[in-house]
Amino acid sequence: MAYTPKPENKFSFGLWTVGNIGRDPFGDPVREVRSPVQLVQLLGEVGAWGVNFHDNDLVPIDATAAERAPIESDFKKALDENGLVVPMATTNLFTHPAFRDGAFTSTDPEVRAYALQKTMAAIDLGVECGASTYVFWGGREGTETDASKSPADTGKWFQEALNFLCEYVMDQGYDLRFALEPKPNEPRGDLYLATVGHMLAFIETLDHPEMIGVNPEVAHEHMAGLNFTHAVAQAWNAGKLFHIDLNDQNLGRYDQDFRFGSHNIKQAFFLVKFLEDVGYDNPRHFDAHAYRSSDYEDVKAFASGCMRTYLILKEKAEQMRENEPIQALLAQITEYDGSIEGFRGKDSSEKEACIKAH
């Protein structure tokens, strides 16, 4: 097998992933800045299907209307020339100093209003570029000390913001759905809605839960020491797996965003197997980063490697499904003779009595 990515694989990368210049809290950038057009060209060369962006990955936060127009025009032209689409967009609500104590959960109502304004404009930009999924990662929605604000209040503010934005999308007639991305910590000491389970419960408290799903990320669940495949399965069973972020991570560490499958190959295999077994057909987004020691040629190899790893694991999953000894063992351990069929399904008083008497 050639392991060549195809459009039906729906492999995508963020501008911030292949465009990462290698800055970290302890070191300066190690790669030069590449423009969105250059990054689209890079992704076209490696055979990616899609490219995603935060609003300010594409348009600088201080750009004027006159400056913005050619940026958008050049980006759309690059998409066409390189055969890429924009499946997802999102808002940067974490870099600007205004968001240092939260965006939708800031104690300052003016900051919360600014977060809504910025997100509405970013939604417009994303839809204009073709996005059908809009991700919310609350990078500053949290605390270092719970003395600073009540989680009861911040939960209500977060609900109000998402309810407002759902109504905005409906008022505009956009064909867009939201995907909430959990993370346990970083950059805040503790982030609200830390895991997939938290997000699934939160979604059901909103006014339009049918519009909202989740965007689980391998690294984020592994930071909490959880089994990512189980989290993905829970989201799938709830009908909420709208998007997924693929990378790799040592359990219990800071957010490492390693190349997909580079550390936990067994977990990566069972994740790919699950996605392929259930027929997941939404974007497969590699929210990962090349090593800081990499140049841009290595960034290209990194991007190709993410997709190649997925395709290799997909092939291995197919081999497992077709392996007769393995399937015979699975059939043996799940064998059922029908002897308790009368107890299965919806509860009734008769079934309760039968189970007690069995």
Locations of regions flagged by a protein language model:
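Histidine-acidic metal/acid-base catalytic patches
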Residues: M1-W49, V59-I61, A66-S73, D80, ...
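Structural motif corresponding to the early beta-alpha repeats
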Residues: E8, T17-G19, E45-K156
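Short beta-strands and strand-loop turn motifs
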Residues: V51-D55, F136-G138, L180-K183, V214-E217, ...
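Functionally constrained cores in energy, signaling, and assembly domains
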Residues: R112, L116-K118, K183, N215, ...
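Glycine/proline-rich, flexible active-site/cofactor-binding loop segments
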Residues: G126, Y134-G138, A152-N185
